[in-house]
C-alpha cells in the first residue's frame, strides 16, 4: 500500500515563513602592524613622479651610479635608490619605469648608502601631518619605514631620507645632504682599499 501526502505549495497569500536573522559581524579595528596572513611573493613597487624627478634632477645630473628600487630580499622591501662609491666599474644597465639605472640582479653592486624619497602626506612629514592625526595607511607606512631603518642599521648601510618638501623647496639642502653621504661612501671605500693592501 502506498500513501501519498499532498504537499501544500506556497501561494501569494499562503507564503512559507522562514525566520531571518541577521548575523552579528564581529568587526575588529584595523591593525596596520599585524600581518594579514597573506604572503606577498610578487610585491611590486610603485613609481611616483617625485622619484622620477629626483633621479633626473639630483642623481643623473651629478653623475651618480645607482640602482633604482633596490630590493632588500630578506625583508621583501624596496628602497628607492642605492648609491655606490665605485663609479669606475662597468655595470650592466637597464631602464626601470623610465629611469636608466644599474641592474641589481646578476652582478655585484657595492652599496655605499641608500636613499628613500618620502612624500609628505603618505609618510607623514611633521610639517604636513600632525602626529596625533595619522590614518591607518600613514601608521603602516611609518611602521615600514622603521623596519627599513632597522634593516639598514643591521647591515651597516647609511640611509638618507629626503622629504618631498625639501626636494621641491630646498634643492640646495638636498644636494648638500647627498654630498655628505657621498663623502661617507668614499671614506668607507678608502678604508676598505687600505685594509686590502699588504702592510
What residue spans do the PLM features occupy?
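Nucleic-acid endo/exonuclease domains
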Residues: 3-199
